[in-house]
């Protein structure tokens, strides 16, 4: 495991203990492991994009929002910026 992966894992473990899942809209159906996995993805995106409130937006609605889906797509290489651009209305 390289240093970056270790730091991301460490940050996600720490964030699980710092963040109450109920605070971001999660119920009892999400396991601590899944919460940590999703949160680690948000941390990775925040580090790549350096947006000030990216982490909060990514965690929004218990990882069910648009930002989380975009983050996962970006990390997997499936993200395309043109997907976020609305098509012009037909004439």
UniProtKB/Swiss-Prot annotation:
Tell me if Phosphoprotein is a UniProt keyword of this record: no
- Protein's cellular compartments: Secreted
The leader peptide range reads 1-18
Domain of life according to the entry = Eukaryota
Instruction: Tell me which Pfam families the record gives.
Output: Crust_neurohorm
Keywords attached to this Swiss-Prot or TrEMBL record, sorted alphabetically, are: Secreted, Signal
Where does this protein have coiled-coil stretches?
Answer: none
| InterPro entries associated with the record | Crust_neurohorm, Crust_neurohorm_sf
Q: Which GO terms describe its cellular component?
A: extracellular region
| Tissues with expression | Expressed by the venom gland.
Q: What is its main location?
A: secreted
Task of the protein: May increase the toxicity of alpha-latrotoxin and/or other venom components. Is non-toxic to mice and to the cockroach Periplaneta americana.
* Family, as annotated: Belongs to the arthropod CHH/MIH/GIH/VIH hormone family.
* Protein name as catalogued: Alpha-latrotoxin associated low molecular weight protein SGV150-311
* Source organism (scientific name): Steatoda grossa (False black widow)
